Amino acid sequence: MFYYIYELLNFNIFQYITVRAGFSFFIAFCLTVYLMPKFIAWAKAKNAAQPIYELAPQTHQKKAKTPTMGGLVFIGAAVFATLLCARLDNVFVVASLLCLVGFSALGFKDDLNKILGGKNHDGLSPRAKLAVQVLIGLVVSSLLYFHGELGSKFYLPFYKFALLDLGVFAIVFWTIVIVAASNAVNLTDGLDGLASVPAIFSLLTLGVFAYICGHAVFSTYLLLPKIVGVGETVIIAAALIGSLMGFLWFNCHPAEVFMGDSGSLSVGAYIGLMGVMTKNEILLIIIGFVFVMETLSVILQVGSFKIFKKRIFLMAPIHHHFEIKGWVENKIIVRFWLIAILANLIALTALKIR
């Protein structure tokens, strides 16, 4: 809406992406901070609490009555801010909104099933959840491939030339990236604030890349792929950062609310989508290193047990391993945040080292 105010009234300030990104950040933050206490009160009244996994560390049992599905509030706030501040005739914005809303709706259904069933395993089956994730990923990826300026070239970090052209197979590759990122953040969301802050850092880094790739002068100077229109996604990233910060106000230890799958699946999917839209699919390994670390711990744990009948970790994902070893929750969370900061600083060096 703000961009169209500029077009109608020639109010120049709203033509700038950075200005509209600033507005989207504050709108999403303020809306989340305003609505979240109301949602928490409603969720408590309806007993919409997070079922705790039976095998989770004993310290988690005290969280049994904590409301969940907070993701509905902050994703809703981010979408609202985007509708106000971004250009809705931009294919990257449309794809982003489809991604956020689609994955959040899937997460809501999963959360609702768990609440109604009363147990953590009463959610959607892994196959059903994966099938819907893949379907949404394919729709979003196809939209970008057939209607966007993204192209299908594949880039490696720290290398300025495209490695190869994936052609139509880019749709499959992008879908894998989006779904993998969605599930990685979902696995990480096991401690108060553990997923939120690394997600904020990831979105900040990807927002920088999106702004530069969408800028004709900066992208040429820094030898990044020039992608017309992708700079508009900075507004969505800013909205999501703002809403996540608003959510963190209530989710920091001890949490008053959990994001649930309604939030984690959507946030992860959008991080993956931003990696796709900025041609940083492989750099996502560094940008989202905490999420990768958590996911690999699960893969290694399951693989080791199936093949060798032995467990590598006391429990997976790896944050549970440290809990069982006796680390207090805050120590695990802050140390993982520090890892996320360092990883994203390393990722940002790809702007100059090419």
Swiss-Prot record:
<comment type="similarity">
    <text>Belongs to the glycosyltransferase 4 family. MraY subfamily.</text>
</comment>
<keyword id="KW-0812">Transmembrane</keyword>
<dbReference type="Pfam" id="PF00953">
    <property type="entry name" value="Glycos_transf_4"/>
</dbReference>
<comment type="pathway">
    <text>Cell wall biogenesis; peptidoglycan biosynthesis.</text>
</comment>
<feature type="transmembrane region" description="Helical">
    <location>
        <begin position="23"/>
        <end position="43"/>
    </location>
</feature>
<feature type="transmembrane region" description="Helical">
    <location>
        <begin position="257"/>
        <end position="277"/>
    </location>
</feature>
<keyword id="KW-1133">Transmembrane helix</keyword>
<feature type="transmembrane region" description="Helical">
    <location>
        <begin position="66"/>
        <end position="86"/>
    </location>
</feature>
<feature type="transmembrane region" description="Helical">
    <location>
        <begin position="282"/>
        <end position="302"/>
    </location>
</feature>
<feature type="transmembrane region" description="Helical">
    <location>
        <begin position="230"/>
        <end position="250"/>
    </location>
</feature>
<keyword id="KW-0472">Membrane</keyword>
<dbReference type="GO" id="GO:0051301">
    <property type="term" value="P:cell division"/>
</dbReference>
<protein>
    <recommendedName>
        <fullName>Phospho-N-acetylmuramoyl-pentapeptide-transferase</fullName>
        <ecNumber>2.7.8.13</ecNumber>
    </recommendedName>
</protein>
<keyword id="KW-0131">Cell cycle</keyword>
<dbReference type="GO" id="GO:0071555">
    <property type="term" value="P:cell wall organization"/>
</dbReference>
<feature type="transmembrane region" description="Helical">
    <location>
        <begin position="193"/>
        <end position="213"/>
    </location>
</feature>
<feature type="transmembrane region" description="Helical">
    <location>
        <begin position="88"/>
        <end position="108"/>
    </location>
</feature>
<keyword id="KW-1003">Cell membrane</keyword>
<keyword id="KW-0573">Peptidoglycan synthesis</keyword>
<keyword id="KW-0479">Metal-binding</keyword>
<keyword id="KW-0460">Magnesium</keyword>
<feature type="transmembrane region" description="Helical">
    <location>
        <begin position="161"/>
        <end position="181"/>
    </location>
</feature>
<dbReference type="InterPro" id="IPR003524">
    <property type="entry name" value="PNAcMuramoyl-5peptid_Trfase"/>
</dbReference>
<keyword id="KW-0808">Transferase</keyword>
<comment type="function">
    <text>Catalyzes the initial step of the lipid cycle reactions in the biosynthesis of the cell wall peptidoglycan: transfers peptidoglycan precursor phospho-MurNAc-pentapeptide from UDP-MurNAc-pentapeptide onto the lipid carrier undecaprenyl phosphate, yielding undecaprenyl-pyrophosphoryl-MurNAc-pentapeptide, known as lipid I.</text>
</comment>
<dbReference type="GO" id="GO:0046872">
    <property type="term" value="F:metal ion binding"/>
</dbReference>
<feature type="transmembrane region" description="Helical">
    <location>
        <begin position="331"/>
        <end position="351"/>
    </location>
</feature>
<feature type="transmembrane region" description="Helical">
    <location>
        <begin position="130"/>
        <end position="150"/>
    </location>
</feature>
<keyword id="KW-0133">Cell shape</keyword>
<dbReference type="InterPro" id="IPR000715">
    <property type="entry name" value="Glycosyl_transferase_4"/>
</dbReference>
<dbReference type="GO" id="GO:0009252">
    <property type="term" value="P:peptidoglycan biosynthetic process"/>
</dbReference>
<dbReference type="Pfam" id="PF10555">
    <property type="entry name" value="MraY_sig1"/>
</dbReference>
<dbReference type="GO" id="GO:0005886">
    <property type="term" value="C:plasma membrane"/>
</dbReference>
<keyword id="KW-0961">Cell wall biogenesis/degradation</keyword>
<dbReference type="InterPro" id="IPR018480">
    <property type="entry name" value="PNAcMuramoyl-5peptid_Trfase_CS"/>
</dbReference>
<dbReference type="GO" id="GO:0008963">
    <property type="term" value="F:phospho-N-acetylmuramoyl-pentapeptide-transferase activity"/>
</dbReference>
<keyword id="KW-0997">Cell inner membrane</keyword>
<dbReference type="GO" id="GO:0051992">
    <property type="term" value="F:UDP-N-acetylmuramoyl-L-alanyl-D-glutamyl-meso-2,6-diaminopimelyl-D-alanyl-D-alanine:undecaprenyl-phosphate transferase activity"/>
</dbReference>
<keyword id="KW-0132">Cell division</keyword>
<dbReference type="GO" id="GO:0008360">
    <property type="term" value="P:regulation of cell shape"/>
</dbReference>
